[in-house]
């Protein structure tokens, strides 16, 4: 009897815990915060399924989704705004059906429901192939439970919808079920750090009675259909995650999309009865061949581009160096063209239109750059990549949606120079830090794999401050900093936006001591291939208290807070580059003062020399010398390394907060 009871309980435990419309007063007691103490909503259930069914002429895919959400406070009111994107192409489309949405509130111990009016569903056209259905659930309050259910019938049956088991709110039950006929073989691509509560599959058989065209008339229009009965084997896959904590953004991350628990599908092979298996998933060479022929990508790189000849000849007139030719063309495009979209896989306008309008998306501008380089007789190709904010590319699978960015590359004397003419402050042969996101591909018949890893970016910053007394009892100083290359890029953006004067006003404000700044200048501000150098003089009025002067020797260069806030982390630390931050202070003591206290020297190594923090202090006569160096050897660290990295930075923060104390001589 006990065994039977245990079996029943175990079976119930594996069933979905919610059904549409079955909301009781007991459900309103659900206020679990152990998964996230700051939660504003709880996803009580998120259940989806995809299955093949009978359509007008062939299979359709039926996607169903049901969600039950508890609204804890007003910060989650946006959960009541629902958007469903649908695709259409030619005569085929995805149709939204059976929309049900209800808000439940507990009033005087009774469950009161408010249903969505069918007239409250609106349609928004995004482009020629996409529309968005939108609606907002009514009467949502703090404490409400909302339910949403809908079906999407798709005439694109082979594109299975992906599923995210994790998001920005805690999820008590997330389930996805897929039924696949034996004719279609898919690759399952999953990611994340949570274990499945249930992961199983079972086989069965199902009969589909389809009507298919038996002959075609003039122009290919169907004039007759016949009935076909198919009984393929069916494999049902089911994945469930339970009690999933939200994944929240922290410092040093590319995008949460790389790390949430998620599954997607790619059709690999079609195998119909009595037919040879047909591979569907492309290979990298085939994928690149398609792009090279695609008129919306590289198909026009070497066609009908005679209009470029005159400009290219003018730019390269009298130049014999291939590198200088490439530089002149690159600078011309960078300085004269405006990017309208920094996330675009395909070109929406021709190279000629881009050339004439002097604007375009990232693909359009950099494809035009490639065409101009080729017109100059240079060996140039596009490179396809994904930016850090877009997500990772799967090296094994050529999936177009994983890419969102095109840059150019030119080969000169066996050396490759990557270029991106959409960013106004990049030097020749440089890419923006957002492009360093791992796997990339050369768009050429060879489809060569390239890698732009953050670990390959070694960025050094060197700062020096000289401080000494002036004739008015104040401290005067000189500040000089050679910024990292990518901080230089940000600096140039700020100066363009605000002007040098306002830039230095912000510097003065951020110095963390009462200073007056003067003689500010920035060297290499317009020399984009070099790091910027910031120089200024300042006067500091030291605060004296009971004959003591307290100074923070790191001033504005201190690491003031630990960038790693959480006690633990379930995804990697992904810095944009490998830092080497150097700071020196030369301090001449003001007359009549001695050093009462100063930081002690320390050297801390991280992980057997993979990082080092040096804080060295010395005094010789009335001169104090201080040096700080924070250097790492990698940009990326695993979750297992997080605690030690966090502790390492905690040492840096505490040391940088220490003060020099000067005492007035009696």
Which residues make up each language-model segment?
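Extended, non-catalytic structural segments that build the interaction scaffolds
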Residues: 313-318, 463-464, 570-575, 595
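Sec-exported extracytoplasmic/periplasmic mature domains
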Residues: 72, 151, 313-317, 334-338, ...
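Bacterial Sec-dependent N-terminal signal peptides
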Residues: 1-16, 666
């Amino acid at each position: 009897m006990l065994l039977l009871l245990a079996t029943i309980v175990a079976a119930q435990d594996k069933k979905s815990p919610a059904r549409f419309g079955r909301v009781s007063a007991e459900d309103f007691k659900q206020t679990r915060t152990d998964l996230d103490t700051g939660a504003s909503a709880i996803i009580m259930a998120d259940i989806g399924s995809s299955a093949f069914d009978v359509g007008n002429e062939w299979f359709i895919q039926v996607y169903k989704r049901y969600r039950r959400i508890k609204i804890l406070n007003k910060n989650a009111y946006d959960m009541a705004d629902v958007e469903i994107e649908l695709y259409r192409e030619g005569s085929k489309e995805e149709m939204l059906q059976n929309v049900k949405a209800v808000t439940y509130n507990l009033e005087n111990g009774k469950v009161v429901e408010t249903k969505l009016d069918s007239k409250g569903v609106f349609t928004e056209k995004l482009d020629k192939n996409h529309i968005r259905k939108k609606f907002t659930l009514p009467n949502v309050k703090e404490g409400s439970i909302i339910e949403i259910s809908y079906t999407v019938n798709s005439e694109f049956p082979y594109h299975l919808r992906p599923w995210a088991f994790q998001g920005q709110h805690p999820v008590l039950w997330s389930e996805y079920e897929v039924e696949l006929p034996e004719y279609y073989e898919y690759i399952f691509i999953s990611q994340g750090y949570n274990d499945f509560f249930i992961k199983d599959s079972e086989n069965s058989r199902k009969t589909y009675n389809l009507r298919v065209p038996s002959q075609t008339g003039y122009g290919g229009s169907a004039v007759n259909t016949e009935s076909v009965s198919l009984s393929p084997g069916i494999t049902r896959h089911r994945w469930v995650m339970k009690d999933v904590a939200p994944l929240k953004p922290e410092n040093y991350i590319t995008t949460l999309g790389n790390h949430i628990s998620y599954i997607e599908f790619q059709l690999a092979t079609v195998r119909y009865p009595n037919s040879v298996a047909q591979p569907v998933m492309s290979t990298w060479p085939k994928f690149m061949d398609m792009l090279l022929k695609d008129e919306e990508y590289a198909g026009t790189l070497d066609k009908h581009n005679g209009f470029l000849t005159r400009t290219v000849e003018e730019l390269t007139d009298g130049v014999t160096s291939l590198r200088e030719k490439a530089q002149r063309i690159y600078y011309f495009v960078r300085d004269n063209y405006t990017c309208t979209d920094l996330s675009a896989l395909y070109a929406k306008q021709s190279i000629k239109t881009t050339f004439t309008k002097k604007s375009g998306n990232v693909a359009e501008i950099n494809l035009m750059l490639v065409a101009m380089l080729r017109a100059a007789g240079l060996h140039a190709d596009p490179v396809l990549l994904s930016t850090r904010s877009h997500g990772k590319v799967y090296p094994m699978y050529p999936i177009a949606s994983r890419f969102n960015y095109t840059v150019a590359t030119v080969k000169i004397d066996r050396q490759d120079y990557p270029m991106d003419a959409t960013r106004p402050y990049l030097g020749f042969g440089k890419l923006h830090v957002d492009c360093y996101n791992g796997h990339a591909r050369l768009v050429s018949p060879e489809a060569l794999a390239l890698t732009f890893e953050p670990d390959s970016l070694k960025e050094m910053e060197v700062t020096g401050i000289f401080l000494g007394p002036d004739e008015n009892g104040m401290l005067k100083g000189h500040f000089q900093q050679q910024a990292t290359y990518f901080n230089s890029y940000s600096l140039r953006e700020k100066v363009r936006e605000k002007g040098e004067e306002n830039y230095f006003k912000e510097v003065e404000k951020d110095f963390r001591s009462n200073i007056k700044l003067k003689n500010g200048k920035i060297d290499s501000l317009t020399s984009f291939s070099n790091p910027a150098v910031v120089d200024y003089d300042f006067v500091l009025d030291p605060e004296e208290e009971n004959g003591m002067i307290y100074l923070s020797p790191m001033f504005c260069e201190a690491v003031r807070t630990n960038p790693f806030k959480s006690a633990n982390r379930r995804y990697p630390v992904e810095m944009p580059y490998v830092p080497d931050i150097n700071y020196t202070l030369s301090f001449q003591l003001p007359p009549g003062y001695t050093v009462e206290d100063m930081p002690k020297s320390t050297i801390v190594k991280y992980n057997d020399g993979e990082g080092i923090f040096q804080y060295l202090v010395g005094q010789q006569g009335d001169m104090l010398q201080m040096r700080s160096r924070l250097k790492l050897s990698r940009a990326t660290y695993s979750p297992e390394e997080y605690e030690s990295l966090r502790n390492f930075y905690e040492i840096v923060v505490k040391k940088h907060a220490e003060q020099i104390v000067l005492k007035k001589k009696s």
